[in-house]
Regions:
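N-terminal cysteine/histidine-rich coordination modules
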Residues: 18-97
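Sec-dependent N-terminal signal peptides
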Residues: 4-16
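Alpha-helical junction/boundary sensor with strong preference for TPR arrays
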Residues: 123, 127-130, 167-175, 211-215
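TPR/TPR-like (Sel1-like) alpha-helical repeat modules
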Residues: 198-216
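Amphipathic alpha-helical repeat scaffolds of TPR domains
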Residues: 92-152, 179-194, 232, 236
Length: 247
């Protein structure tokens, strides 16, 4: 009996680890107010993150997880974790002025205790000061919509997804993103689906399925990999929508 329990325990651990994502603590200094605080950094993950349900919103781990948006508990400066330490010096004064207007409901000792959508709302204004391109904003509002949805704020989630949709359309008409239409049309389909426009979503999925993804800035193997992933995901998405309609 003990052997069976032990074997089952090992099987459980192996199953858990196959899909596990891990974080570890690391101290960072806020580039605005110089406050030192313990944040979380990525430990481990695998390709399984691209097969989680958030793929239907074209949002992936780590941005689906709470530690991914850093926020200084003192001045409330907030960005994605990978941008936190690389803020241009010439933006600090403007950021300081903006952050002086940010008022939270209470003081937080740990950044993880600050609601994710609150951090994203601050980060939205921070990134407006820093300046970002259409692709960034298209993704940012998908992420924001995802987290509003997680908090069951359907109205805010829809607002964010409509913004993502607007940026995706801008990308579609911009020659900078030439060759990436398959991915952009998929994003448009995904956002349409999550604002309740399922018929439009299916139309855009059909359009995307006829294309091949291209990106001259990437290695050929990476381009091929994303194209194959999108092809498979489009098929899955059509089935996903049909199943939703049957429920």
């Amino acid at each position: 009996m003990k052997k069976i329990v032990l074997i089952l325990g090992v099987v459980f651990l192996l199953t858990f680890n196959v899909n596990a994502t891990t974080w570890f603590p690391s101290e960072h200094t806020c580039p605005v107010c110089k406050h030192k605080h313990e944040y979380q950094e990525i430990g481990s993950y695998g390709g399984y993150i691209y097969h989680r349900p958030s793929k239907y919103q074209y949002v992936y781990w780590p941005l689906t997880d709470f530690p991914s948006v850093y926020c200084c508990p003192k001045c409330h400066f907030a960005t994605y974790m990978w941008d936190f330490d690389s803020i241009p010096e010439n933006k600090v004064d403007t950021l300081t002025k903006f952050l002086s207007t940010v008022k939270l409901e209470k003081k937080y000792k740990d950044y993880l205790d600050i609601p994710m959508t609150t951090r994203l709302e601050i980060a939205e204004n921070v990134y407006k000061i820093l300046g970002q391109d259409n692709e960034f904003w298209c993704k940012f509002y998908r992420v924001q919509g995802y987290h509003y949805d997680q908090e069951e704020n359907k109205e805010k989630a829809k607002e964010s997804r409509l913004k993502s949709l607007d940026y995706a359309r801008l990308m579609l008409s911009d020659s900078v993103y030439s060759g990436q239409e398959k991915e952009i049309l998929f994003i448009i389909a995904a956002m349409n689906n999550f604002i309740g426009q399922k018929d439009s979503a299916l139309i855009y999925l059909d359009k995307a399925s006829l294309l091949t993804y291209e990106n001259k800035k990437w290695k050929e193997e990476n381009v091929k990999g994303l194209d194959e992933y999108l092809t498979d995901l489009i098929k899955q998405y059509k089935e996903f929508i049909r199943k939703e309609d049957e429920e």
